Amino acid sequence: CMSARTRPEPPFPSAKPARAETEILDVFDPDPGRQYDMRDLLGCVVDGDSFDEYRADFGRSLVCGYARIEGRPCGIVANQRMMTKRKMPGGKAGPSEAVNMPAVIYDDAADKTARFIMDCNQKRIPIVFVHDTTGFMVGRDSEQGGIIRAGAKLVNAMSNCVVPKISLLINASYGAGNYAMCGRAFDPFLTLAWPNARCAVMG
């Protein structure tokens, strides 16, 4: 790490987060059964209104976006800890909506995040990963939807990403979800964990 004397100045002026930092304790709940909106938590961390979400209406089980922290640009990949909905292609009855479980990575979100990681890598923007996941969705419907292909695409994008990566474990980080979110195996530049964080290859 660079000392404060040799560290380059941020390219943008720093700004206070849109929400007070103390509100993190009101937003986040360590109880695995409780839900919260990851965007509210990010609002307590990033500079002002700098968070620019990437494809907000697609792959909602993962929140991706560009932001600034203390004036320094970064990409953010965070698990969504609340139920979300996704549009499903319909048959005779037409399109329908399905409910996504909290903290689970679905195929559409994995696809979106892989593309976002590749974009950050091309733009030389460091990435912050905020872990709160129980892993990838399993089951017949998920496999028919392409979770294996999408999950492999996400892990491949991660393994080829050369920009600095920071991992923040705020709750659970289990199974293949830990790998997809830049777990220890990908040697992140820095790993931080809240006191209640739990991390394991098998959940």
Predicted regions and their residues:
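Ligand-binding clefts of soluble mixed alpha/beta catalytic domains
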Residues: 1-203
